[in-house]
Amino acid sequence: MNQTAEKPVLVSVQNLHKNYGDLAAVRGLSFDIFQGEVFGLLGPNGAGKTTTIEIIEGLRQPDGGRVRVCGLDPAQESMSLKERIGAQLQSTVLPDKMRVDEALRLFAGFYRRSASVEALLERFGLKEKRHTFFEKLSGGQKQRLALALALVNEPEMVLLDEPTVGLDPQLRRDIYALIERFRSEGRTVLLTTHYIEEAERLCDRVAIMDRGQLVALGTPRELITRSGQGTRLELRLAKPVGLERLKVIDGVIDCHEAEGAYFLRAQPPAVTIAALVRFLEADDNALVDLHIARPSLEDVFVEMTGRRMEA
């Protein structure tokens, strides 16, 4: 049994619908998020991700279906819910002349319970920037401040909308470490991202949306295995061989030739590689070069939506 299935459900979305005039932004969406997991919501632009998150957060009213977050109805109990969740939005912008510690104290005053400002400054590496104006912060420092503001009320769940957009690889890794720390503390994280490798690294489970509907749900590994994409093999041989002979090797899904190399998709790859070695020995042929690439969440995304993730 999946370990998450043994944990309490923190977010329940059942048959959710939301329309904007004649446009159905969300159509019959259902999923659960378990306590303590990092849950990724993926989809191309216009898939309905933002609308779904806004409904979960209590910012929009659904037209149909049932949503519960921390046991509360976001549409009817939004004030109570705000005490229990934190949200870091991509467009977080503070006044240019607001200092870091002022922002934290301001946000702390919005809640009945709040974390220590000093502890937040220490935790997010902002202690030396406490008196710095927002306009003087780097992109990475602004993102760390946004995360600190999302945790100012010690929430059970954090909603992160594109938390690493625009950051260089090292700063993205710093944010990854913070998100992994959230999970180690038992917090639930709902994450949207345009970086497939980010979802594959951070998320316990992901939901892929397209045109307002759920098209895939599971752990990254489950989705990759379930997709039947197969492992990609690129090989160069001592002597040419006909594609029709490669296609009948055990486990080969399809193959093609380009620029003197043979490209195979195989499932399971171990069976195909063993059969390939036997085939080459019998044919008095040999491998000159072999590259193996396992399928990725990007492959699943393209298969499900017909589009690549917009970075």
Regions found by a protein language model. Give the residues of each.
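ABC transporter nucleotide-binding domains
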Residues: P8-V11, K18-D210, L214-A216
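A generic structural signal for secondary-structure junctions
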Residues: G86, A108, R112, A207, ...
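ABC-family P-loop ATPase nucleotide-binding domain
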Residues: M1-H17, R307-A311
